[in-house]
Swiss-Prot record:
<dbReference type="InterPro" id="IPR030823">
    <property type="entry name" value="IolE/MocC"/>
</dbReference>
<comment type="similarity">
    <text>Belongs to the IolE/MocC family.</text>
</comment>
<keyword id="KW-0170">Cobalt</keyword>
<dbReference type="InterPro" id="IPR013022">
    <property type="entry name" value="Xyl_isomerase-like_TIM-brl"/>
</dbReference>
<protein>
    <recommendedName>
        <fullName>Inosose dehydratase</fullName>
        <ecNumber>4.2.1.44</ecNumber>
    </recommendedName>
</protein>
<dbReference type="Pfam" id="PF01261">
    <property type="entry name" value="AP_endonuc_2"/>
</dbReference>
<keyword id="KW-0456">Lyase</keyword>
<dbReference type="InterPro" id="IPR023952">
    <property type="entry name" value="IolE"/>
</dbReference>
<dbReference type="GO" id="GO:0030145">
    <property type="term" value="F:manganese ion binding"/>
</dbReference>
<dbReference type="GO" id="GO:0019310">
    <property type="term" value="P:inositol catabolic process"/>
</dbReference>
<dbReference type="InterPro" id="IPR036237">
    <property type="entry name" value="Xyl_isomerase-like_sf"/>
</dbReference>
<dbReference type="InterPro" id="IPR050312">
    <property type="entry name" value="IolE/XylAMocC-like"/>
</dbReference>
<dbReference type="GO" id="GO:0050114">
    <property type="term" value="F:myo-inosose-2 dehydratase activity"/>
</dbReference>
<keyword id="KW-0464">Manganese</keyword>
Amino acid sequence: MNKIWKLKNVKVGVAPILWTNDDMPELGGDISFDQAISEMAEAGYQGTEIGNKFPKDEKILLRELKKYNLEIASAWFSGYIISDFEKNFQDFQKHCLFLKALGAKVVVFSEQTYSIQGQNKPLFKDKPYFTNQEFENLAQGLNKFGKWSKQHGIELVYHHHMGTGIQSLKETEKILELTDPEFVSLIFDTGHFAHAGEDIVFCLKRLISRIRHIHLKDIRKEKINELKTKNLSFLEGVKQGIFTVPGDGDIKNYPLFFELLAKNNYQGWLIVEAEQDPRKANPLEYAKKAMDYLRSLISW
């Protein structure tokens, strides 16, 4: 029997990607926004992140969320600091102001210059790498973006991600070392670190001081091995079922992970995320399965 760890000042949400995949509309394209948010609430979650099917008008979105007592935790932003700083900065400012109007406190940033996460390229064979100069340029840009967002009440959290220039623990540590902790924090994604071959507890110990947002998923190792053997892309891997919800895959040290979060007084959102094919993995069923698993390990 695992000890249940108390996490103070934590909220638990679920990402809309369980229902509809923004990168592959064929996955859950027939599922409505209302179905998704009603099922999030039914499964016991307090909030969510923004997906493509969400209303773009903040007043309408807030009204719909209020029906189910849900909050917006954050939203993804595709960064192009290395390749197109000025336009990207303008887009970022608009994005942050939208999030602020929704009551969010965090913006999820991922540098997409050279990214293959949405392309039909072998994920491991064609992984992009940033030069030292590109790391420096990215860090300087992140400091500027993060300083601006902080002035407007939004914290920038960097998302390490498969198929990008910042995927591994080493790459994540490098960008954190180069950036100002006052302006740049980290979103810790258990699924992406595990997918990259990292141990989530080891990574957590190394990075805990910078973590302000967390995505929780699980992985299926046999599917990752298949992806490597067949030279599949990131999105093909998703379709094959590489990811699932916490407790349903091969990450076995979640109890220790949550113990460390509690002992380090983590504050912020925990967002359950697992991009799967909703025809194979019923979103409501998997959202409830994840909630049951979390409640067996933590209280909040």
